[in-house]
Amino acid sequence: MPNPHYRSTSYRKIHTKLPSGKSTIHYERRKNNRAVCAICKKPLQGVKTNLLYKYSKTEKRPERMYGGYICYKCLENLIKQTLRGSS
């Protein structure tokens, strides 16, 4: 039976064969997926997803409109559409 803190689903099991020939289970924290744009689904640049508690608020995402949700290209198109539509 594993230790209680390894029974969580936030750890993934890795079956490892040791040099002695025995096989054991090693536990490793799961890694988060990359952050993607809400419109075009491309990976976002400058957005951290793992171990967020180590970073300050400004390091976790860009400080601009829709930072961390929409990529710069989609934001550029969105701004153009709103400006052209309002005139």
Swiss-Prot record:
Task: Give the Gene Ontology MF terms in alphabetical order.
Answer: structural constituent of ribosome
Q: Does the keyword Electron transport apply?
A: no
User: Which cysteine pairs are covalently linked by disulfides here?
Assistant: none
Superkingdom, taxonomy of origin: Archaea
Q: Spell out the GO cellular component terms annotated for this protein, sorted alphabetically and separated by semicolons.
A: ribonucleoprotein complex; ribosome
> InterPro entries, alphabetically?
Ribosomal_eL34 (IPR008195), Ribosomal_eL34_C_sf (IPR038562), Ribosomal_eL34_CS (IPR018065), Ribosomal_L34e_arc-type (IPR047868)
Ordered alphabetically, the record's keywords are: Ribonucleoprotein, Ribosomal protein
Asked if Secreted is a keyword of the record, the answer is no
Query: In Gene Ontology terms, what is a biological process of this protein?
Result: translation
Q: Which family does it belong to?
A: Belongs to the eukaryotic ribosomal protein eL34 family.
Question: What protein am I looking at?
Answer: Large ribosomal subunit protein eL34
- Source organism per entry reads Sulfurisphaera tokodaii (strain DSM 16993 / JCM 10545 / NBRC 100140 / 7)
